[in-house]
């Protein structure tokens, strides 16, 4: 336990929290251009072909972002909006692409959880 005098001289040390999304530079989302769109396989107990894209952000950094939902229209030079949020079974994928904004269209025929996939309300 420090004395009052020690606290006056040195003060308390602030703990610095390391960010999980450094490429966003403390913004909620960032715009970027797809440089490569491809599929990759997840870690050990799971098996699939996960759709991911390599994106060059406006901050100048290049990140790997996950494309959520069933089917997508993204290709090289597509302009996308990237948010934070990792994919647990894909190592190195710490960002998600926001569906339904810029060049990324929303998921077709989506009835539930539509707001996460940029899908309009069905008529």
UniProtKB/Swiss-Prot annotation:
CDD domains: Ribosomal_S12 (cd03368). The modification 3-methylthioaspartic acid is found at residue 89. The keyword Calcium does not apply. InterPro entries: NA-bd_OB-fold, Ribosomal_uS12, Ribosomal_uS12_bac. It comes from the Bacteria. The keyword Ribosomal protein applies. PROSITE patterns: RIBOSOMAL_S12 (PS00055). Keywords: Methylation, Ribonucleoprotein, Ribosomal protein, RNA-binding, rRNA-binding, tRNA-binding. It holds the Pfam family Ribosom_S12_S23. Gene3D superfamilies: Nucleic acid-binding proteins. One of its GO terms (molecular function) is tRNA binding. Part of the 30S ribosomal subunit. Contacts proteins S8 and S17. May interact with IF1 in the 30S initiation complex. This is Small ribosomal subunit protein uS12. The lineage of its organism: Bacteria, Pseudomonadati, Thermodesulfobacteriota, Desulfobacteria, Desulfobacterales.
């Amino acid at each position: 336990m420090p004395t009052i005098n020690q606290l006056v001289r040195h003060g308390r040390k602030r703990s610095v929290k390391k960010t999980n999304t450094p490429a966003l530079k403390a913004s909620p989302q960032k715009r970027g251009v797809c440089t490569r769109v491809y599929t990759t396989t997840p870690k050990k107990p799971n098996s699939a072909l996960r759709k991911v894209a390599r994106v060059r952000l406006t901050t100048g950094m290049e990140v790997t972002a996950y494309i959520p939902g069933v089917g997508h229209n993204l290709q090289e030079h597509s302009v996308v909006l990237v948010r934070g949020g990792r994919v647990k079974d894909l190592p190195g994928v710490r960002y998600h692409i926001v569906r339904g904004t810029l060049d990324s269209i929303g998921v077709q025929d989506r009835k539930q959880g539509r707001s996460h996939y940029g899908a309009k309300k069905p008529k």
